[in-house]
């Protein structure tokens, strides 16, 4: 009788463990599928343009137009602001309204550099913290890895659940400072004037 109880107890434990393992495999498989679809859509997109909104530390929202051309080229032109941003393969360039260089910073060790590469594999260059679906959005939380200068830098990406377009990104550095950009009126794989990525030097 004792052996019967012990065997039954072991059987129940095995069933519970099997259920947990099966559920975990299903969740992991679903996450992989979502990640693959987003990667496919992102890698098939060579150019992007639209409007962006940036939230500052004081909760003030500023806006402008953005243009991205892979690999590494982007232009963020702010509304009613004297300075804009143009990125290249090596630098984040701060420019005036006529695109003359004001200052520049290395881009290679920044998360945006990885996101704007020709092809991306999230699991290769980031640690996946979580993948969540809610309503019509997919939120992927990433952590930079294999990069000593970005230890602790977290990247939160929100995609549309219908067409896997990027809706917003938030980059949180190791000091807890957040850079949040929301994207609207997005157009993909369009022709972009090369002059938008030109940085002039006086």
Question: Where are each of the predicted segments found?
Answer:
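Bacterial N-terminal signal peptides that target proteins for export
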Residues: 3-15
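N-terminal signal peptide c-region/cleavage motif recognized by signal peptidases
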Residues: 24-25
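Short, hydrophobic/aromatic-rich segments at coil-to-beta transitions
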Residues: 47-51, 71-75, 91, 134-141, ...
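A generic structural motif
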Residues: 53-55, 77-79, 95-97, 143-145, ...
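An acidic-aromatic
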Residues: 66-114
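A short, Trp-centered hydrophobic/proline-enriched beta-strand micro-motif
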Residues: 40-59
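Cleaved targeting-peptide boundary
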Residues: 28-36
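Gly/Pro-enriched, hydrophobic low-complexity segments
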Residues: 124-202
């Amino acid at each position: 009788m004792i052996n019967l109880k012990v065997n039954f107890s072991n059987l129940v434990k095995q069933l519970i463990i099997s259920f947990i393992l099966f559920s975990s495999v299903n969740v992991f498989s679903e996450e992989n599928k979502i990640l693959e679809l987003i990667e496919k859509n992102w890698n098939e997109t060579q150019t992007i343009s639209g409007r962006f909104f940036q939230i500052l530390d004081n909760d003030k929202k500023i806006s402008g137009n953005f243009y991205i051309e892979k690999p590494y080229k982007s232009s963020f032109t702010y509304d009613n602001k004297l300075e804009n941003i143009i990125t290249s393969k090596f630098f984040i360039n701060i420019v005036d309204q006529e695109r003359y260089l004001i200052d520049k910073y290395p881009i290679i060790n920044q998360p945006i550099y990885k996101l704007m590469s020709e092809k991306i594999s999230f699991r290769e260059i980031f640690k996946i913290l979580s993948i969540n679906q809610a309503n019509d959005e997919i939120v992927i939380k990433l952590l930079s890895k294999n990069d000593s200068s970005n230890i602790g830098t977290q990247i939160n990406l929100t995609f549309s659940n219908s067409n896997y377009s990027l809706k917003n990104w938030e980059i949180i550095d190791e000091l807890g400072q957040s850079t949040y950009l929301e994207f609207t009126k997005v157009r993909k794989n369009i022709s972009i004037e090369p002059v938008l990525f030109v940085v002039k030097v006086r």
